[in-house]
From Swiss-Prot:
Gene3D superfamilies, per database record: 3.40.630.30
Protein known as: Acyl-homoserine-lactone synthase
Natural source organism: Pseudomonas aeruginosa (strain ATCC 15692 / DSM 22644 / CIP 104116 / JCM 14847 / LMG 12228 / 1C / PRS 101 / PAO1)
Gene assigned in the entry: lasI
Catalytic activity as recorded in UniProt: a fatty acyl-[ACP] + S-adenosyl-L-methionine = an N-acyl-L-homoserine lactone + S-methyl-5'-thioadenosine + holo-[ACP] + H(+)
Organism ancestry: Bacteria, Pseudomonadati, Pseudomonadota, Gammaproteobacteria, Pseudomonadales
GO-annotated molecular function: N-acyl homoserine lactone synthase activity
Length: 201
């Protein structure tokens, strides 16, 4: 697999189109979420804010996109703050250049690992943690399902809730903080911290 992280304008239209079609397949067709799909692509207003994306591609000549993540700076609009503020349960929405929000995670991989995540998902999480720490990001926030929360906890990540889960659409949704501290890094990388890897790379 090939993992790339960059701003929207750094990716060509072909890759962005594949990403938006993948999101439509995963969120609308597979999960049945109430999302808007235009020309077989799932796009929302946050995609107009020059977000960062992680694109996961097959390591083949076609290099088809089969996974993606959207990454937004919390100093501007983002989903937890502006779309799902009820999941904050009255707490102040994070606003810091050192905190990013993850959203629109989609992957086409049926392989499951021992902790519930596919090997591809775990590799994507490692790449995201490495990139975040390289850019002085200390905390990630996300709106996800209770099922994914359980897998994160089982994997050993340092995860905490803003408050109880709520039923949103067909999902039991929860807002989480993920600290990119030693606990999370050891869970993702074993005994060697990301900072140590960066220092010798």
């Amino acid at each position: 697999m090939i993992v790339q992280i960059g701003r929207r304008e750094e990716f060509d239209k072909k890759l962005l189109g594949e990403m938006h079609k993948l999101r439509a397949q995963v969120f609308k067709e597979r999960k049945g979420w109430d999302v808007s799909v235009i020309d077989e692509m799932e796009i929302d207003g946050y995609d107009a804010l020059s977000p960062y994306y992680m694109l996961i591609q097959e390591d083949t000549p076609e290099a088809q996109v089969f996974g993606c993540w959207r990454i937004l700076d919390t100093t501007g609009p983002y989903m937890l703050k502006n779309t799902f503020p009820e999941l904050l349960h009255g707490k102040e929405a994070p606003c810091s250049p050192h905190i990013w929000e993850l959203s629109r995670f989609a992957i086409n991989s049926g392989q499951k690992g021992s902790l519930g995540f596919s090997d591809c998902t775990l590799e994507a999480m490692r790449a995201l943690a490495r990139y975040s720490l390289q850019n002085d990001i200390q905390t990630l926030v996300t709106v996800t399902t209770v099922g994914v929360e359980k897998m994160m906890i089982r994997a050993g990540l340092d995860v905490s809730r803003f408050g109880p889960h709520l039923k949103i659409g067909i999902e039991r949704a929860v807002a989480l903080r993920i600290e990119l501290n030693a606990k999370t890094q050891i869970a993702l990388y074993g005994g060697v911290l990301v900072e140590q890897r960066l220092a010798v790379s």
